[in-house]
Amino acid sequence: SFIGSAPPERYRALVRLARDAHMNMLRVWGGGVYEHDAFYEACDDMGILVWQDFMFSCASYPDFDEAFVAEVAREAELVVKRLRNRACVALWCGNNENQWIDDMCHTHDPQVPLFGQRLYDEVLPGVVARLDPTRPYWPGSPYGGNDHNSEREGDRHNWQVWAGQVYPRRFGE
């Protein structure tokens, strides 16, 4: 897909809409792009926090390929150096839905590796710890305990909102 070009005023207007709607955090999704500086400037100016994903989403990644791992580390270093002085960046997140999809497909089978796990557990948190140690790193979203889409810990993606598949909240509903 092609990303359109938006002038800084457009970023400011959209962030202002989020602020005026009483939002306090926006997520830069791992299946998208690292946003333009105008986005982060607007968030800084308007007090909006940013949940910043690294650009890994809904896929397997060849963490057994050392050249690929080195490229990921270089990209992460550039991104963290670029954004670490921004007041708006609240946390770094390793990926979007990769652990959860692995859980869904492989039902926790230890014989089936999650390609990319090394990136989320070693490479990316290592870069963040070295270059931006005051901010938290979260391995993925959703992520929590042994069930990456747990209702009891971590963060959760609720896929039951589609096509009226909402689960009951309590017995009898």
Task: Explain the meaning of each model-derived region.
Residues S1-A59, F68-L91:
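Active-site-adjacent substrate/metal-binding segments within catalytic domains
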Residues A6, F64-E71, Q111-G116:
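Alpha-helix N-cap and loop-to-helix initiation/capping positions
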Residues G31, M55, N96-E97, P142:
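Active-site beta-loop-alpha junctions enriched in small/polar residues
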Residues Y34, Q99-D102, Y143-N146:
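Active-site environment of divalent metal-dependent phosphoester hydrolases
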Residues D37-F39, Y61-D63, D147-N149:
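Short Asp/Glu-rich motifs
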Residues L78-P113:
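Active-site groove signature of glycoside hydrolases
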Residues H108-Q111, F115-E173:
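Extracellular glycoside hydrolase catalytic/binding regions
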